Each structure stands twice: as C-alpha cells, then as structure tokens.
Amino acid sequence: MNLELLESFGQNYPEEFDGSLDCISLAVTCAFNKYGTLLAVGCNDGRIVIWDFLTRGIAKIISAHVHPVCSLSWTRNGHKLLSASTDNNVCIWDVLTGELEHKYRFPSPVLKVQFDPRNDNRLLVCPMRYAAVLVEVGGTHRCLPLDSDGDLNIVASFDRRGKHIYTGNAKGKILVLDVETFEVVASFRIIVGTSSATAVKSIEFARRGDAFLINTSDRVIRVYDSKEIITLGKDGEPEPIQKLQDLVNKTTWKKCCFSGDGEYICAGSARQHALYIWEKSIGNLVKILHGTKGELLLDVVWHPVRPIIASISSGLVSIWAQNQVENWSAFAPDFKELDENVEYEERESEFDIADEDKSVDLNADAQQDEEIEVDVQKVEPVAAFCSSDEEGEDENALQFLPMAPEVEDPEDGWTGQDGLEPSAVMLGHMEPHDYEDDIMASKRRRMQLYDVSLPDAPTDETHPLISSKASKDKQQPVGGKKAAGRTKK
C-alpha cells in the first residue's frame, strides 16, 4: 500500500467493522510494529501470534509462555519483541527466527512492559504494587524513585523520544524522571474539585507531537502537552488541553490510545465492547463504534499510519476501518460516473481510424511539454514513517516476515531424516540426532536467564488478569438451587 496515494482529505478515523482475526486460542493483548505491517497478538495459552496485517494472514506463531501473555512491545526497528506473562516472566524474542534471547524472572506479577523508543537495549517493567524497574538488556536493573507519599500503585511510560519516564500513582501524583540520572525534572498532581485526588490508571503518548493522555479513576481522560509540563518544572499546576469523558453513561475506560497522527483519541469502555473516538484539537466526540453486546473489552490499539483500530474482546481481534468507496475518476479525470444505464450516442468520427475532420494544429510541437528525467533509482523516505528529527527511514527495519510454501507431496530428497534438510545432515560429518542436539545447545547458549531481585516485593499477589477470570468462574448461575433455597436463620 502506497501511503502517499491514500485519501488525505476528510475524516481520518474508522467508521465501521471490517472483519476479525481469529488466533484459534483466545487473544488477550496486541501491539502494532512501527510501520503497521505486523500485528503481534498475545494469547491466553501463552502463544504470540504475529499477523501480516496487509494480507490478514498469520506470519509466525511463537510458543512464548506457559501462562497468558499480558503485555507486548516492539522495538523501533521491529527485530525484537518484548512480552510479559502472568507467571512473572519477561522475555525478549527475535521476531525473524522466533528464538528467545533474554528471559527475566520477577518476584511479583508484571502489569506492563515497554521498550525504550530509541534504545533497543533498555526496557521498562511495571511490577504490581512496586516501583517501576528500568532494565538494561544483558546488564543491571534500577528501580525508579517513588514520590514522598510512598504510594506503590505505580504506572509508568516512556515519552515519545525515550528521554524521560512519566510515572503516576494512586494519589494522582505525576513525576517526570530523566532516563539516565533518574532526576525529577517536573511533577504535578491531578486534583478533582478542590482537594480530592484521583488514581492514575494509565499514561499513553502520541506517536507524533508532544501530547500525552492520563486515564484516571474518576472516568476522565486528561490530555496534556509534555513541553508545558517540563517548562513548569516541579510542583507545577498545568491545565489539561482537553478533558474527555462520557457525560451520559459515566463510562470507565479500560484502555486509551492516540491515532497515528496524534489528532484523535480512542478509548475503550470497561463495561462493554464500545470504542469512543474524540478529536483532540476541539474535544468533541466524533464516533462511537459498538461491538457485540455482552462482550467485555480487553485491549485497543490504533494503526500507526492508517485510520484502523484493532480491539480485543471474547478472544477475537476486531478490526475497525473506513468504508472504502471506489473513486474511478481518480484514475481517469474525464471518466463520468452514471447512476443508471444510459444509451451512448457516438460522436462524429469518434471511432474512425483516421479523423478526416481533425484540424491541423501548427503549434503542436511548441506546446509539447519539455522532457523531464524521472529518477527511478532513488527511494524517497515516506514522511509517515519518519520522525521530525530523522532524515530518512531505517534501512534495517523489519517490515515483513518471509513465508515458505507448504509442500503437500514433497519429491524424493526434499527433506532428510526426521524432517531435516539434506544439506544439514548429508554434507556434515554428524548424525541427525547429533545435529538436533547441537541446535538445542546453541539455543541454550544464546538464551540468557536473569533472576531480578526486588527488595520487599509482594510475592503473594495475583495478577489482575487471573483474578478477574477467577471471580467470573466463581459466580453462581441465577436461579440455581442455592439461589432458590430458603435462607437459614
């Protein structure tokens, strides 16, 4: 898809349901890569399914974890994928080969993981009821400093360029920390009314611009300008650019995100499968997308460069897009569209081989356009894929995964013993089983395991993803024998 040829006028947000992606197992969370060509979906059985979003087909399946995957994050170039599961494990995967490179075991449940937007060797981990942890890949880890009130319900996120980390707690206090020194650059508190504070549930940054949003427990989404926050410094009192909420239903928000260009904000309801879309500049509600009734929303992500939203509910990934209208006049300006059949009247000498009535134009040669050399070798960078501080695209970025055709009836000699390629076994001086052992040994050497020690970390906590499922299973059906029985006195 050539992004330069897409319709850039009119509304830039999805309007209708455009199909679903079935991962066979139940989908829990998802994340787009930077280019929007690959969609990683974390499933309930621990697998990560990577979809080719252009063909809407499965490109790769990684058997990542044993427990459900709760968070995913891509590197900037798309070669690495970060995943966290409900068994307190955080893993870094090579997307091209599907191999595990690094594994971190935490003592407490992990709620969110995120790669540094500009540094593939740095990641942010948010454990449950503990300070956020900044991990250097293959090196050390550091805990982010807490506010003076010592609240441990921390949410954290990198800013767009990875220079600062924004943290928020249950008392509405926001800290802006320098990534290198952990120095508090700015801080402010979200206050409802005159004195009461509200808990911070999530912090999300736009891919373009300096805006970021804070989802709080008072059911209001506040949009701020990061430049203004840093300018005001410590204990500032910034005013939000917009306050977004559902005034009618007082909806609580499960997940919020920006559009690829940062001009729209999407929020998913925590009570039903409904997506609310606002325009950031003026704050008006432009669209509500309704899914199947009775479904609960788990995750929402916006495509990085196109007006497409992916939402997860009932184990399926729902795709929301614009209604595509065919515009044939865009290819032929003189093309005339008809609402009904019309008998065509041939013009005089229209289909003649030689037009006898054509007048001779003496100035035809002079009116011809000058010849222009067209450069077919130089590849111009696509503006949608480049940041404001970049001159061009990353040539080493991974946008697509190679696919191999499945051969139903392979010819003789196509594969060796145990399904191995003949070149791997026949050309070497080893048996097939020795070759398999060599592969397993190299994978073990390549994968590095780390036990992250967090002092006084809560080890008896249950991940919210598991506890919510357990509470649903314990609910008794209405009208059962226990409900119909008489209460004892």
Curated annotation (Swiss-Prot):
Residues 451-489 are annotated as: Disordered. The keyword Transcription applies. One of its GO terms (cellular component) is MLL1/2 complex. Keywords: Chromatin regulator, Nucleus, Repeat, Transcription, Transcription regulation, WD repeat. The keyword Transcription applies. GO terms for biological process: chromatin organization; heart development. Component of the SET1 complex that specifically di- and trimethylates 'Lys-4' of histone H3 and of the MLL3/4 complex which also methylates histone H3 'Lys-4'. This is Retinoblastoma-binding protein 5 homolog. The lineage of its organism: Eukaryota, Metazoa, Ecdysozoa, Arthropoda, Hexapoda.
